[in-house]
């Protein structure tokens, strides 16, 4: 699979990116190199190769030793919000930064 400059321009347009011609060529080169590597890996014959062991498969039926989900500290939201300039229903109010 190989991309063209038109493919890069289309994807950039969909992503609302403005690429200079040299950026387009650089991106095209990088992506085509990536696709060439993927094609090389796909061409490798893996018949008879055992999959690597997965830790969960090695453990099998043994129960995982996880700690109980218990709150270790009390809720201090009110104390944290005392110095906040604006709070509403337990949430910090901040100025709008995106139009």
From Swiss-Prot:
The GO biological-process annotations, alphabetized, read as: glutaminyl-tRNAGln biosynthesis via transamidation; regulation of translational fidelity; translation
Would I find Hydrolase among this entry's keywords? no
Q: Which InterPro entries match?
A: Asp/Glu-ADT_sf_sub_c (IPR036113), GatC (IPR003837)
Spell out the reaction equation it catalyses: L-glutamyl-tRNA(Gln) + L-glutamine + ATP + H2O = L-glutaminyl-tRNA(Gln) + L-glutamate + ADP + phosphate + H(+); L-aspartyl-tRNA(Asn) + L-glutamine + ATP + H2O = L-asparaginyl-tRNA(Asn) + L-glutamate + ADP + phosphate + 2 H(+)
Question: Looking at its record, which EC class is this enzyme?
Answer: ligase
* NCBIfam families, per the entry: gatC (TIGR00135)
User: What is the recorded function of this protein according to its Swiss-Prot or TrEMBL entry?
Assistant: Allows the formation of correctly charged Asn-tRNA(Asn) or Gln-tRNA(Gln) through the transamidation of misacylated Asp-tRNA(Asn) or Glu-tRNA(Gln) in organisms which lack either or both of asparaginyl-tRNA or glutaminyl-tRNA synthetases. The reaction takes place in the presence of glutamine and ATP through an activated phospho-Asp-tRNA(Asn) or phospho-Glu-tRNA(Gln).
The name of this protein is Aspartyl/glutamyl-tRNA(Asn/Gln) amidotransferase subunit C
